[in-house]
C-alpha cells in the first residue's frame, strides 16, 4: 500500500528531495523508484519466511530448526544524501520482521524524514511502533 501510494503520488517527496536534499529531478525520481523497490522487496520476503520454520540436517545427524522472530527495537539513522530510499529500506526491513523502530533522519533532511514516517502512519503502522526524533548529530550520538 505504501509503495503504491508513493508510486502514484511521488510529487511531495520529489519536491523535497530537490529542495531539501539538493537532488536534480532525475536523481529524485531515481531515489523514489529505489524506495518503492525496497518496500516491495521486503514485503515479498517477509511473506516467504513468516511463520515458516526450516528443518536443517546437521553435520553429525542432529536436526536443527531455523526460525525467525523479532529482535526488539531498532534505531534507523538516515544519511542526508539518500534520505528517502535508505530510510525506507531500513524502516521496512525492521517493521517487516516485527520490530519497533525509532527514526532519526539527518538534520539536513528532517522534512523528508517526517514525510516518510507520515506515509507509514497513514497506512496503518502505529505511532508506538514507529517513532520519529528530530535533531542534530548529537541526538544520534546519544541514541
Where on the chain are the PLM-derived regions?
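Rossmann-like NAD(P) dinucleotide-binding subdomain of oxidoreductase/dehydrogenase enzymes
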Residues: 18, 22, 46-143
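N-terminal Rossmann-like NAD(P)+-binding subdomain of aldehyde/semialdehyde dehydrogenases
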Residues: 1-62
Amino acid at each position: 500500500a505504501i509503495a503504491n501510494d508513493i508510486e502514484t503520488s511521488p510529487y511531495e517527496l520529489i519536491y523535497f528531495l530537490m529542495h531539501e536534499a539538493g537532488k536534480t529531478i532525475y536523481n529524485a525520481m531515481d531515489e523514489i523508484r529505489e524506495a518503492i523497490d525496497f518496500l516491495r522487496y521486503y514485503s515479498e520476503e517477509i511473506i516467504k519466511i513468516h511463520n515458516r520454520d526450516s528443518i536443517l540436517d546437521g553435520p553429525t545427524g542432529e536436526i536443527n530448526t531455523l526460525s525467525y522472530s523479532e529482535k526488539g527495537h531498532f534505531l534507523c539513522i538516515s544519511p542526508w544524501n539518500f534520505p528517502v530510499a535508505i530510510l525506507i529500506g531500513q524502516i521496512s526491513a525492521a517493521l517487516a520482521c516485527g520490530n519497533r523502530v525509532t527514526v532519526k533522519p539527518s538534520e539536513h533532511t528532517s522534512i523528508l524524514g517526517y514525510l516518510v514516517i507520515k506515509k507509514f502512519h497513514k497506512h496503518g503502522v502505529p505511532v508506538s511502533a514507529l517513532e520519529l526524533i528530530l535533531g542534530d548529530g548529537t541526538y544520534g550520538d546519544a541514541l
